[in-house]
């Protein structure tokens, strides 16, 4: 019997890198609400007292970048210099310019179906049936822990009102013959007000954050809990560390369990295959697993700049496939249009929804219907996390002729 440990981590919405991701995606959302043809590549850096927003944008829209940036920071919970960062008073520097026409000529086409990829690159999507979210268990639990920290922190009349926005989690699982059987270690570090006793913090975190999230069946007397192991975490957020867009790509995806092509997501409109094709690859892999074609599935796609058709599509099921990987690949090519325009249409990606993705993972979330207001004041219905739907599983299963 083989036995091994595997670890994944996550960070909260108040982590400096996640502040940057959320600002970049808030800018993207605000522009897409007014201009569906916009091209956006927005990068953010946050450090003590300042947020720098830079990048390349081609759009007819106008947004109040300073007000938008401040709102994101304040909504996260950085509203006082006492906390270490204040959205009301921090500086906001706008360094956004226009996108290169050399890129535009490679992407835009008279026939939208022939829209070229915005850049070359390779992307991976992954799914597993070890959790209800079709995500690896370690990253799933890590996300839920920091999400719970934020929920408790923002709760009205919270008993843990001394919690601050910055937090990190880490979960180590023990696997026996490829099956998760126990939690070996948990790390939860949370920023807090000064004067909080370590004993009180540990007890509160155990009861209010860890217990509601961690499955009791995986906890045992040997499980190690490391709660604020340095003893104090008062200085956090952009004061403690400089934050940058796109620096948490493993947190954003599969926690290291699956491979990664290297491209970040936040601040990029759907013409950038770094983002849209990674979402599509997850959609494909999840439907393959939901169809029962495999217990685990990893899909790789790759592109050349200005070219519509993927340069490759490959599938790996790690020996768990109910049919050959080559057959699954043929089914994918038949049932999914993985050209850039095909992905955008298939997943309905051109509308505001991206700030929601910028914390607690881009994958393993539930599709959510919502409405938004465009630049004319008109209301529109849309769905976020559409790539998490399993609406093609039945067709795949039927085509594979599985009983």
Curated annotation (Swiss-Prot):
UniProt name for this protein: S-adenosylmethionine synthase
Gene name, Swiss-Prot/TrEMBL: metK
Binding sites annotated in the UniProt record for ATP: 15, 166-168, 232-233, 241, 247-248, 264, 268
Residues reported in the UniProt entry to bind L-methionine: 56, 99, 241, 272
Subunit structure: Homotetramer; dimer of dimers.
Claim: Plastid is one of the keywords in the record: no
Subcellular location: Cytoplasm
Organism (species): Xanthomonas oryzae pv. oryzae (strain KACC10331 / KXO85)
Cofactor: Mg(2+); K(+)
